[in-house]
Amino acid sequence: YPLILITINFFYMIDKFIRTQYLDIFKQIGNIADNQKLDCYVVGGFVRDLILDKPNDDIDIVVVGSGISVAEEFKNQNKNSTLSIFARYGTAAVKLSNNIEVEFVGARSESYNKNSRKPNCKPGTLRDDQLRRDFTINAMAICLNNDRFGELVDPFGGVKDLGNRRIVTPTDPKITFSDDPLRMLRCIRFAVKLGFEIDPNTWSAIIDNSYRINIVSRERIMVELNKIMQCKGLDLQRGFSMLHSTRLLEYIIPELSRLDTTGKEGYERKHKNIFYHSLKVLGNLSELSDNIWLKWAA
């Protein structure tokens, strides 16, 4: 049954890709890459949401070679566009006159030091680049070169995991989360946002690596928490319950985590569990208001 759905979704996706409003952009980028004798792909969230039939305006292009050189020529061919180059990271972004932004990066492999989530990068293959992605559903790519235009490259079964509504990492989850602990928050955010389940091994790896969230800046943590806060009702309650169950909340907002009186002496059946009561208040409020600061106050 899931396989049938996956097959239907795959052919529907290809049809949608050919009809997408960004088709001319993709064709243009593919032609530039062909002229430079480089392979290029649209990757990540755009591909995921194309399959899920969800809107996504984030266009990320991976070039096996220099992403900057393709971006520069793309800018030259589009009048009134602006080009931003980040040479240190080998990335570039072109903002078109209609405000569509396309980001370019050269395919790369990454390695990490234990005390930092900032990777050491070196040029790599498409597979290297897909291996460094956080989850299989974000590791898919669609080729833009003319001879393979529209071909899906899915080495880790991202389409299948979408069909099974499952969040799983493309490599050992313990390594994935130890290398970049922010991915643990992203994992919960995607699970809540998409209504997916987290793979058991992936879930266990979050618990085992929860303490590693301490090496992530508070600013980056707040960005992810605020994205979870944008959910509503039971989804929002589920998000914070998952943060608590994985012990991430214990390291991020220990005061909130300590509100859970489950199993604490003197609280059995005598008092309302303040933590889960607070989650219910938060969920109810989120159905009435999108004000993120009002939600935090709850």
What do these predicted regions represent?
Residues 2-6:
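Extreme N-terminal basic, low-complexity initiation segments
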